[in-house]
Amino acid sequence: MDFQLQATDKHARAGLLNLAHSQVATPVFMPVGTQGCIKSLDATDAQEILGAKLILANTYHMYLRPGEKAVGQLGGLHRFAQFQGSFLTDSGGFQAFSLSNNVKLQEDGIVFKSHIDGSKHLFTPIKVLDIQYSLNSDIMMVLDDLVGLPAPLKRLEESIKRSAKWANLSLEYHKEKNRPNNNLFAIIQGGTHLKMRSLSVGLTHKGFDGYAIGGLAVGESVDEMLETIAHTAPLLPKDKPRYLMGVGTPENILDAISLGVDMFDCVMPTRNARNATLFTHFGKISIKNAPYKLDDTPIEENCACYTCKRYSKAYLHHLFRAKELTYARLASLHNLHFYLELVKNARNAILEKRFLSFKKEFLEKYHSCSH
């Protein structure tokens, strides 16, 4: 993997990420494709209509169903899903914790029960890499010990030491495997305790292909989250991509870009779409509301997305009310277009040294009215 830092505007960064299957311009938003697809969309929607170059798939879910060996036999995630871009896969640790009532944390890994059939499984740092090798992920995340917030200081210290130990073990194994097309990212933990974040960075080897700021958006306030990012991002290697996991709103993303973050993922655009909430530059609208029943205009005037160029709010209102499956596709295409355009415009602003004014103008407009 090659990461080229092209421009900075104060702390905001614009770069190019060269992966085995694509070249990705940063800042980048990665649509979430948990089961190997973005919910309600296929690979053609992702790559040709949205122009997405990098999407996230979930190691936990692909391991349990259909199984990483099946995906490997079928040519890896790219061939299986017919997606010509790149995949980032997370380690599955978060899902093991959040989806199972019976999780046991051990020094060598995480024991959990499948949310599908109750069968017992062990994720170790090596096991999750082997799964991701079978998936042939462009970017693989190490197994980490995630802590919900608030958390006692002792638990945070345990988490960062265990996460760093697992990360460094993963890096040693990855070097032995000699798989240059599968890049390995470390994850920095420590909650909102800044000293713990510094310690986590210090304990983590500097030889990873990229670094993620994990363990945020799990119960802390927005101010605490931003303070943690502002503290942590400058501690990470400047020549490696920085990934903020699972965040978030348009405001969160712009704030994090201004603090030096390059990569983002979140289920918000697609989940909100399925639940009738659509993003516009003037804020969010709820398409299920009665005023849209006879509204013959697109979701947003001047929006170039597939949906806005073809369909009215009235049609989307009808599809949602009728519980038609097509609604989820059209709404998701719009919301993902909004997010992808947001980071694209942020990138252009960084290249032109006007990011702060771009951010200010966007937020003023976005908060100007509610629908």
Curated annotation (Swiss-Prot):
Its cofactor is Zn(2+). Binds 1 zinc ion per subunit. Pathway: tRNA modification; tRNA-queuosine biosynthesis. Gene3D superfamilies: Queuine tRNA-ribosyltransferase-like. Catalyzes the base-exchange of a guanine (G) residue with the queuine precursor 7-aminomethyl-7-deazaguanine (PreQ1) at position 34 (anticodon wobble position) in tRNAs with GU(N) anticodons (tRNA-Asp, -Asn, -His and -Tyr). Catalysis occurs through a double-displacement mechanism. The nucleophile active site attacks the C1' of nucleotide 34 to detach the guanine base from the RNA, forming a covalent enzyme-RNA intermediate. The proton acceptor active site deprotonates the incoming PreQ1, allowing a nucleophilic attack on the C1' of the ribose to form the product. One of its GO terms (molecular function) is metal ion binding. The keyword 4Fe-4S does not apply. This is Queuine tRNA-ribosyltransferase. Pfam families: TGT. NCBIfam families: Q_tRNA_tgt, tgt_general. Keywords: Glycosyltransferase, Metal-binding, Queuosine biosynthesis, Transferase, tRNA processing, Zinc. The active site is at 90 (proton acceptor), 265 (nucleophile). One of its GO terms (cellular component) is cytosol. The keyword Phosphoprotein does not apply. Residues 246-252, 270-274 are annotated as: RNA binding. Zn(2+) binds at residues 303, 305, 308, 334. One of its GO terms (biological process) is tRNA-guanine transglycosylation. It catalyses: 7-aminomethyl-7-carbaguanine + guanosine(34) in tRNA = 7-aminomethyl-7-carbaguanosine(34) in tRNA + guanine. Homodimer. Within each dimer, one monomer is responsible for RNA recognition and catalysis, while the other monomer binds to the replacement base PreQ1. Substrate binds at residues 90-94, 144, 189, 215. Its EC number is 2.4.2.29. Belongs to the queuine tRNA-ribosyltransferase family.
